[in-house]
């Protein structure tokens, strides 16, 4: 009787632990950068070094984060024409092999 009670207790503990592990999100430890405010000012293409898109479902807005030559990160609205033009410019710039 004591063995079956101990076994039942052990199984319940294991089941509780397993459900907690399975209920966690897939990327619980991966950091997510979100943009909460987007710039309305056009940034000169000469000041831009790179960009990345923010598309995580954990973020309230889709955005593009531009990194400037000075190291600043600026959030922008991806649907604006100047943002799309800047992305195209950076893509072309990064595809061109440097001598």
Swiss-Prot record:
Q: Where is the signal peptide?
A: 1-23
User: Where in the chain are disulfide-linked cysteines found?
Assistant: 34-59, 35-75
Q: Which InterPro entries match?
A: Chemokine_b/g/d, Chemokine_CC_CS, Chemokine_IL8-like_dom, Interleukin_8-like_sf
SUPFAM superfamilies in UniProt: Interleukin 8-like chemokines
Record keywords, A-Z: Chemotaxis, Cytokine, Disulfide bond, Inflammatory response, Pyrrolidone carboxylic acid, Secreted, Signal
Asked whether the keyword Signal is assigned, the reply is: yes
Localization, per the record, is: Secreted
| Major subcellular site | secreted
User: Mind telling me which PROSITE patterns this protein's record contains?
Assistant: SMALL_CYTOKINES_CC
> An example Gene Ontology cellular component term from the record?
extracellular space
Record's comment on post-translational modification: Processing at the N-terminus can regulate receptor and target cell selectivity. Deletion of the N-terminal residue converts it from an activator of basophil to an eosinophil chemoattractant. N-Glycosylated.
Which residues are annotated with the PTM Pyrrolidone carboxylic acid?
Answer: 24
- Record carries keyword Signal: yes
Q: Which domain of life is it from?
A: Eukaryota
Task performed by this protein:
Acts as a ligand for C-C chemokine receptor CCR2. Signals through binding and activation of CCR2 and induces a strong chemotactic response and mobilization of intracellular calcium ions. Exhibits a chemotactic activity for monocytes and basophils but not neutrophils or eosinophils. Plays an important role in mediating peripheral nerve injury-induced neuropathic pain. Increases NMDA-mediated synaptic transmission in both dopamine D1 and D2 receptor-containing neurons, which may be caused by MAPK/ERK-dependent phosphorylation of GRIN2B/NMDAR2B.
PANTHER family noted in UniProt: C-C MOTIF CHEMOKINE 2 (PTHR12015:SF98), SMALL INDUCIBLE CYTOKINE A (PTHR12015)
| Subunit and partners | Monomer or homodimer; in equilibrium. Is tethered on endothelial cells by glycosaminoglycan (GAG) side chains of proteoglycans. Interacts with TNFAIP6 (via Link domain).
Provide the family line. Answer: Belongs to the intercrine beta (chemokine CC) family.
List the protein's name. C-C motif chemokine 2
User: In which organism is this protein found?
Assistant: Sus scrofa
Cite the source lineage: Eukaryota, Metazoa, Chordata, Craniata, Vertebrata
Q: Which gene encodes it?
A: CCL2
């Amino acid at each position: 009787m004591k063995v079956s009670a101990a076994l039942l207790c052990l199984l319940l503990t294991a089941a509780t632990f397993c459900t907690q592990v399975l209920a966690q999100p897939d990327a619980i430890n991966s950091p997510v950068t979100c943009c909460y405010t987007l710039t309305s000012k056009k940034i000169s293409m000469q000041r831009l070094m790179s960009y990345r898109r923010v598309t995580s479902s954990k973020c309230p807005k889709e955005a593009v984060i531009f990194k400037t030559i000075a190291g600043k990160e600026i959030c922008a609205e991806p649907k604006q024409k100047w943002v799309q033009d800047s992305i195209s410019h950076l893509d072309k710039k990064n595809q061109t092999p440097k001598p």
